[in-house]
Amino acid sequence: MFTLKKSMLLLLFLGTISLTLCEEERDANEEEENGGEVKEEEKRFIGPLISALASLFKG
């Protein structure tokens, strides 16, 4: 059971890193297309991430 939780946590972590890298690349491409304009976006990712991790460790 513990190894399953570790595996799930590892997959979540790697998915988060992958998603972050894709978002950065997409933002760079959009900035290039818009002539250097930068859009401000409010990101609310940490709240759901913390609740998911808490539910994972409650078990």
From Swiss-Prot:
InterPro entries: Frog_antimicrobial_propeptide. Residues 23-42 form a propeptide. It holds the Pfam family FSAP_sig_propep. It is found in: Secreted. Residues 1-22 form the signal peptide. Its main location: secreted. It comes from the Eukaryota. The keyword GTP-binding does not apply. One of its GO terms (cellular component) is extracellular region. Transmembrane segments: none annotated. The keyword Protein biosynthesis does not apply. Expressed by the skin glands. One of its GO terms (biological process) is defense response to Gram-positive bacterium. Keywords: Amphibian defense peptide, Antibiotic, Antimicrobial, Cleavage on pair of basic residues, Secreted, Signal. Belongs to the frog skin active peptide (FSAP) family. Temporin subfamily. Antimicrobial peptide. This is Temporin-CDYd. It comes from Rana dybowskii. The lineage of its organism: Eukaryota, Metazoa, Chordata, Craniata, Vertebrata.
